[in-house]
């Protein structure tokens, strides 16, 4: 073989190797352990989320920038940190390197600790945690981890948006705070009091209650205390049965006050709200049911397939970010994907989003919506009630963004 021919062959071989590396991840199956409740009082929430993950995975498997296939592997954690750790052990035993969880910051905190230890002790078998709904601010502050990425806005960000809205509602004078007795509920109360004192010092906090998570079946005693306090407004971070049963008890007692919530759109709560709650129930989130466009089409298709609402939309952002990061890293290795996720910016269903490098907290726009009858502008019937959540305020990412004290070590 002549020297020029040799060079040509070597060049082609090098190009082939480069192309192979560029698409090394293409066709790979990426298993994601979904660790959340499928039994107990919070089962309806978990069942909706699992369906949503499987639906979005199927959508991305048809087309994503990394050319990978996502497979969601469910584990029932019964909203228990201990059960979450058992599920994580089972997942790692099956060589599953991606974990997603959201229902309960207690479980999220336990997973972060265990994943940190696993990744330190088992180089080459690192696990990456995508948190889609556990919103304790400590997870991206004092307890931040290189291996943890949060898709939802945290408690402090949501409260920043809620209190920015409340500030201009001059009829609000007396507030009662009720929450679940774990990290999230405690943080909601803390930030509500601090933000109200800063923005509306004239508002009185006339009562505060914490109750066990997913254990209370009758909220009548709590509602009686709210009524007796003279509150005109309730702030709550409750979710699942703890919100739907609270609202049910409030309706039965004729408690005619405003509720500012984080999760009034979650399974079961809209049905519990009913017509009597119209104009009084607000929720803050990274979207709402009447956004239309791409996410509107997904909602309609999901409802046609399952007769259920697709409301945990950051699941879409999660797989969008993961597939973009895998394409960027040219790998499905969690070590390389974590590095590619840091600082990643893209356009999602709710506008421009950015995975902030300093603490792995997603930066995104937030909306406040109110419960009302469907109309031409807001046509999506939530849980087939004839009612919907209509947007009343929209805040750009920078408005609700909060600073971080995170001091994580970046990279391995």
What name fits each language-model region?
Residues 1-31, 93, 405, 409-412:
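Short, low-complexity disordered leader/linker segments with a strong preference
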Residues 42-66, 191-198:
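Short, polar/charged alpha-helical segment
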Residues 29, 44-51, 63-139, 151, ...:
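Beta-alpha junction/loop-to-helix N-cap segments that form part of ligand/metal-binding clefts
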Residues 91-105, 122-132, 174-179, 230-240, ...:
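Periplasmic-binding protein-like
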Residues 83-86, 137-138, 146-254, 287-297:
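Extracellular/periplasmic Venus flytrap/periplasmic-binding protein
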Residues 145, 247-319, 327-332, 384-411:
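Extracellular/periplasmic periplasmic-binding protein-like sensory domains
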């Amino acid at each position: 073989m002549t020297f020029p021919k040799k060079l040509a062959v070597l060049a082609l071989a090098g190009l082939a190797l480069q192309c192979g590396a560029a698409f090394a991840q293409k066709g790979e199956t990426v298993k994601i352990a979904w660790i959340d409740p499928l039994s107990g009082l919070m089962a309806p929430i978990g069942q909706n989320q699992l369906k949503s993950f499987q639906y979005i995975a199927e959508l991305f498997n048809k087309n994503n920038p990394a050319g990978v296939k996502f497979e969601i592997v469910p584990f029932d954690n019964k909203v228990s940190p201990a059960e979450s750790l058992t599920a994580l052990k089972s997942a790692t035993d099956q060589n599953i390197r991606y974990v997603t969880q959201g229902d309960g910051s207690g479980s999220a905190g336990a997973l972060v600790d265990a994943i940190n230890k696993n990744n330190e002790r088992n180089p080459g078998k690192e696990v990456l945690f995508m948190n889609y709904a556990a919103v304790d601010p400590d997870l991206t502050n004092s307890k931040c981890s290189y291996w943890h990425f949060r898709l939802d806005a945290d408690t402090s960000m949501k409260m920043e948006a809620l209190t920015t809205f409340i500030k201009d509602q001059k009829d609000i004078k007396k507030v009662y705070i009720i929450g679940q007795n774990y990290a999230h509920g405690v943080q909601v109360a803390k930030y509500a009091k601090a933000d109200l004192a800063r923005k509306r010092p004239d508002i009185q906090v006339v009562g505060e209650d914490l109750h066990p998570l997913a254990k209370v079946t009758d909220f009548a005693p709590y509602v009686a205390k709210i009524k007796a306090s003279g509150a005109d407004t309730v702030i709550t971070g409750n979710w699942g049965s703890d919100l739907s049963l609270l609202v049910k008890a409030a309706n039965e007692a004729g408690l005619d006050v405003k509720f500012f919530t984080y999760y009034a759109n979650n399974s079961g709560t809209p049905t519990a709200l009913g017509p009597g709650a119209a104009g009084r129930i607000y929720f803050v989130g990274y979207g709402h049911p009447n956004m239309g466009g791409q996410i509107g089409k997904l909602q309609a298709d999901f409802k046609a397939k399952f007769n259920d609402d697709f409301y945990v939309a950051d699941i879409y952002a999660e797989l969008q970010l993961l597939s973009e990061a895998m394409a960027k890293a040219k790998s499905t290795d969690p070590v390389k994907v974590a590095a590619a996720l840091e600082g990643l910016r893209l356009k999602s269903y709710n506008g421009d989003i950015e995975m902030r490098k300093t603490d792995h907290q997603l930066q995104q726009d937030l909306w406040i919506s109110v419960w009302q009858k469907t109309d031409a502008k807001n046509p999506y019937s939530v849980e087939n009630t004839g009612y919907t959540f209509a947007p009343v305020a929209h805040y750009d990412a920078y408005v609700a963004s909060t600073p971080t004290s995170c001091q994580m070590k970046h990279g391995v």
